[in-house]
Amino acid sequence: MIAWRLPLCVLLVAAVESHLGALGPKNVSQKDAEFERTYADDVNSELVNIYTFNHTVTRNRTEGVRVSVNVLNKQKGAPLLFVVRQKEAVVSFQVPLILRGLYQRKYLYQKVERTLCQPPTKNESEIQFFYVDVSTLSPVNTTYQLRVNRVDNFVLRTGELFTFNTTAAQPQYFKYEFPDGVDSVIVKVTSKKAFPCSVISIQDVLCPVYDLDNNVAFIGMYQTMTKKAAITVQRKDFPSNSFYVVVVVKTEDQACGGSLPFYPFVEDEPVDQGHRQKTLSVLVSQAVTSEAYVGGMLFCLGIFLSFYLLTVLLACWENWRQRKKTLLVAIDRACPESGHPRVLADSFPGSAPYEGYNYGSFENGSGSTDGLVESTGSGDLSYSYQDRSFDPVGARPRLDSMSSVEEDDYDTLTDIDSDKNVIRTKQYLCVADLARKDKRVLRKKYQIYFWNIATIAVFYALPVVQLVITYQTVVNVTGNQDICYYNFLCAHPLGNLSAFNNILSNLGYILLGLLFLLIILQREINHNRALLRNDLYALECGIPKHFGLFYAMGTALMMEGLLSACYHVCPNYTNFQFDTSFMYMIAGLCMLKLYQKRHPDINASAYSAYACLAIVIFFSVLGVVFGKGNTAFWIVFSVIHIISTLLLSTQLYYMGRWKLDSGIFRRILHVLYTDCIRQCSGPLYTDRMVLLVMGNIINWSLAAYGLIMRPNDFASYLLAIGICNLLLYFAFYIIMKLRSGERIKLIPLLCIVCTSVVWGFALFFFFQGLSTWQKTPAESREHNRDCILLDFFDDHDIWHFLSSIAMFGSFLVLLTLDDDLDTVQRDKIYVF
């Protein structure tokens, strides 16, 4: 059995040797080589050249070695293969080097340089050998040049700027060792020109080093770069207390926002990219210390806790002032029957006998508007309270009856004999005309705003938190820092968070939102106590006190802080709506609160209000996903925007006393015929018409701007629409308040002035634009800037500080704006 197998084995061995002899080289040329010397040799399929190098490696001294190769023959199909064999690593590359780009495009490089990874040594000094093997399958001679150099400045030093050149086929990397006492550094790389696009990578000191465009993303942290790049590196992430800074030029510029180069139509024809060289400078500087973290947190807490202290001091002062005032009134006007001062009907100046339920009318006490129209025609209409006589409050029936507080009672007027269509369509209305419903009914109605937004907040925030944690985990695991748009020059990590300072600065929204809730709670407690003791000022005077919307506003401010912090965990275009969703809520709630002040009975319900805000957020998401450059989307949105503006204008103008049904067009034509064609009559509600005309002009202009310009940041565009409408309504409210003879007390006036100033500074810092996800990550980093406050906070953090204070101040303005009316009867307070 063995006898016949032996000849077969001999034949197989002979065949293999014959095959290897046919494929393998005939000659091997080995020579000792020296550093800093250029070797020009030839190689073909019959010859392999081996160069032997040796150098002394010292344990406490790191030295870089760089191999440079240039193939002089431009031939296709048979590249040269260079293999560098070291003690613990092997590096191989072909020349011409072919790297692939987008759509598998091929780019050819005749000159290649690679830095060798130095293996560590345990001895004080050691002579190490490495070999460079050169081979090819080309049957003809191929001429090449080989040179091995020692790299000067291979080890980067803290605070020293180093400049170098690199290309896609000549990547560079350098070593940095953490000095004693330094736990964190920031690696800054800059260039005077944006292109060619490059990649900055931070890798552990291991072999091999991934320093080509097609493998640089395999390990470590990396980010694309045009003119700026910055990566914060912590000692705890590198057990060897050192790392490599790798710089690679990409084959194409599309990742950095550039255009694709011309590509030949010949299939598989590589493009020579030898001209893509970039000059860069690298600087490693110490990052902030733990003391800076503590100082930043104490500063942030100190600023906002000072508002708590100021609020307590103001509350104590106001309490002392009220006690003093009450004591003086008690001395001057003590009532012997009750033994303590109490506001009576005749204590209101200018009161007249009560004449039934038409207390919203003027002068004659009737429900007719003839007198008003007549006065208007003569130009003698006055907006001051002193020129009108009103009914006494004491003789008026209580509006907070013990009737049912079911949902069906929300839109009933059982406490009057007049039809609400008559009351609400009078030419001139007073707050008493629109504050006729049961107080408990309205309280329940407006409390729904708070409970609904609390529910929305929970269901919205939990998935958001989960998602941004996933984003941060992906960044930490993959090392791809292009996922998140930080200000990398001022991004201070803490734990797993990459930019803790941007998250910390959102604390103001939460703390000031909570403070606003506490202020509202105190006001509500005081108001309820006044109601319990039948204080007629609380019962019959001033703007009706409903606190549900204020609670909703405070909750929205807190949620804005939470969601803004979530957005800044990993800011990018896919989660920007997290940062803006509750801004829409705040803008909408503020407008509703302004409207509720003078229209408590007919304000929108929480369900319809939040449904409208949900539609806004829905369009925000659609705009982010589909709106960029999509003409059809912008046409549809602009049409919906204009139609919604017209419908809302009609609702506000007619105080809800109109119907959207099949007869709407017939009624419109009838109004146009009677008021414009038969006789030219002006609008019945002039003030409302002025506001709505201005609002329509602004909204139509914004719709036209969006349709023509089609801004990339749709979420901010949508927010701008809400803010413009809020500012317009707020300005109209203040103007009409002053025009009606009312005044603004000192505290709200100070709030208005201070808030306006703070908003101005806040917007200045907001428009600094430290990053933008409307561009590529590399282009966004061109806007990055160093910290400007305590070496810990950047411009956007200051925007967070100031905008939270400004929002809090704006809420206080809404809360205190009508405090001057607390002693004015509601049938003397105009509706506008």
UniProtKB/Swiss-Prot annotation:
The modification Phosphoserine is found at residues 401, 403-404. Residues 315-447, 521-546, 627-631, 710-715, 768-796 are cytoplasmic. GO terms for biological process: cell morphogenesis; glucose homeostasis; regulation of insulin secretion involved in cellular response to glucose stimulus; response to glucose; RNA catabolic process; RNA transport; type B pancreatic cell development; type B pancreatic cell proliferation. GO terms for molecular function: AP-1 adaptor complex binding; AP-2 adaptor complex binding; DNA binding; double-stranded RNA binding; nucleic acid transmembrane transporter activity; RNA transmembrane transporter activity. The chain crosses the membrane at residues 294-314, 448-468, 500-520, 547-567, 606-626, 632-652, 689-709, 716-736, 747-767, 797-817. Highly expressed in the liver, brain, kidney and intestine (at protein level). Residues 1-15 form the signal peptide. It comes from the Eukaryota. Glycosylated. PANTHER family: SID1 TRANSMEMBRANE FAMILY MEMBER 2, SID1 TRANSMEMBRANE FAMILY MEMEBER. Belongs to the SID1 family. This is SID1 transmembrane family member 2.
